[in-house]
Structures are given as C-alpha cells and as structure tokens.
C-alpha cells in the first residue's frame, strides 16, 4: 500500500527519498530512474559524499542522462569515491528507491515527479532481494570521463588558479557543454596554447588530439576563436588560442559558453 504520496520537482522528490534512506542507512538501490532523477541523483550523491547508491537502469537512459560533461565528470567522481555504482540490466517498468528499511516509488511526469512511500515490509523485502539479484547479473556501466576533481586539479596545476576558477564558475552554473569545447574556450579566454590544452585534455581522457582539432575547426568557422603563432626555438610554431571578438572576451566565462553555444547552433 502507498501512503504519504506527494508531487514536487524531481530534485525535491529525490531529496525526500534520500532523507528516508539516510535516516536508517546510507546504502540503497535506485532502480529504473528517469533521466531527470539520474541527473539529480548524481549531483546529490556527489554533494552528500556519505551515501552508497547502486543504480540499475537501461544503458540508453544512462547514456542520455549523462551526456553533459560536468554531469559525466561528477558521476565519474562519485563512482571513483565509491558513492555510486551503475549497472545496466533488463529492469522493471516501475521506478523506485529501496533499502532494507525504506521503499519509495517515483513517477516522473514532465517537469514534476510524484513519490509514494510503500510501507508493506514483505513487498519491500522482495524488491530489495530482486534488486540484489539484478545487480549481480547486471553489466557495469563505464563512464568515459575523468573524475571532476582530477580535471580541476590538473587545470590549476598546469595553467593556474584563474583557469580553474573559470572552470568552477561554469560548473556552478551547471551549464550543459561538450568537454572539449569547454576546454578550448578556457584556453581562448586565457590565451593559452592549443597544443598544451589539447595535450592536457587528451591526458585527462576528455578527448583525443584529433577531437580537439575538429572542435577547434567548429569554433573557428563559427567566428568564436582565432589563433596566433608562438615562435619556438626548435620545431614547428605553436598556436595560441584567442577569442575572435572583444565582446566575447569581456564576458564572464559561464556567459561566454552560453553565447558560444547559441553561435554554434546558428551555423
């Protein structure tokens, strides 16, 4: 039987489910979540740091939900820190969060979601056991992104705190942006060498040098960035990335990203 049913934003619903879980434990299964719940779960687990969530979902849904670089990097951080694990499997149509002591169903509709607490201990025990079984046979989902803190630390170490500060400002605004585009715009904003940022991004696993070159072409053709040669003693000249417009250069970094996204979409 369901009781205490309520409707609110996805984040509020997720917060309530987690408050129920953490009242007695820090370990639960999240089964068949919607894309919005996946997003909120990743952000919340990353911020809480004191929970262990096992997510069971379809591969396509997880891939779609974690498309944005910042969210993907937060998920990678949570996984590396053992706060979250993700596996894909054939799963039931109902969405729920279950621990040994609590069971909440979650229904997502548009911009809102509904949560219902199920108090029948037999149903809860059955779903917990079924989730354990599905988990054991599920396929581990690999996130092809470096953990967020690794990116932050490397940017500060290699390029300075001001570069990391701009990265963090974009993170704070939760801007959905491709990771390679993000790093190229950081480089152009701070007039860094393309070779250095491309190498850093490749070492981190954000993208290959070839991907950085392709994205640079996209930004150049959209009129966003330009380059200037940087002479070196030996070998081919390197190129420094520059923003092509003083109006772009004067924008705060999060606003720069948003403006560039609009410019690319118009191409």
Please place each PLM-identified region on the residue numbering.
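Primarily the HKD phosphodiesterase
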Residues: 17-74, 175, 179-207
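Signature of lipid phosphatidyltransferase scaffolds
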Residues: 107-171
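PLD-like (HKD) phosphodiesterase/transphosphatidyltransferase domain
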Residues: 1-55, 165-168, 238, 242-247, ...
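Helix-turn-helix DNA-binding helix
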Residues: 211-212, 216
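Beta-strand-enriched, solvent-exposed domains that form extended recognition/catalytic surfaces
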Residues: 207, 224, 240-242
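A short, conserved structural fragment
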Residues: 220-231
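Short, cationic-aromatic polyanion-contact patches
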Residues: 229-256
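HKD-type phospholipase D/PLD-like phosphodiesterase module
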Residues: 56-101
């Amino acid at each position: 039987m369901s009781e205490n049913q309520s409707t609110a934003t996805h984040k509020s619903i997720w917060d309530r489910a987690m408050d129920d879980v953490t009242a007695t434990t820090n370990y639960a299964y999240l089964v068949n979540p919607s894309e919005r719940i996946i997003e909120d779960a990743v952000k919340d687990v990353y911020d809480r740091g004191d929970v262990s969530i096992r997510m069971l979902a379809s591969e396509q849904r997880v891939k779609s939900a974690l498309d944005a670089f910042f969210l993907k990097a937060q998920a990678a951080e949570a996984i590396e820190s053992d706060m979250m694990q993700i596996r894909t499997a054939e799963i039931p149509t109902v969405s729920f969060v279950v621990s040994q002591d609590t069971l909440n169903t979650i229904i997502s509709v548009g911009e809102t979601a509904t949560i219902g607490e199920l108090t029948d201990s037999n149903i809860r025990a059955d779903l917990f056991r079924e989730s354990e079984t599905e988990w054991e046979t599920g396929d581990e989902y690999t996130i092809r992104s470096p953990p967020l803190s690794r990116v932050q630390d490397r940017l500060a170490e290699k390029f300075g705190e001001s570069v990391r500060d701009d990265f963090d400002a974009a993170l704070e605004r939760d801007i959905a942006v491709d990771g390679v585009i993000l790093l190229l715009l950081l480089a152009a904003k701070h007039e860094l060498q393309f070779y250095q940022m491309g190498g850093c991004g490749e070492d981190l696993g954000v993208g290959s040098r070839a991907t950085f070159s392709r994205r640079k072409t996209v930004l150049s053709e959209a009129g966003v960035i330009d380059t200037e040669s940087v002479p070196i003693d030996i070998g081919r000249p390197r190129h420094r990335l520059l923003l092509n417009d003083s109006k772009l250069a004067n924008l705060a970094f999060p606003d720069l990203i948003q403006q560039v996204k609009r410019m690319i979409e118009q191409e």
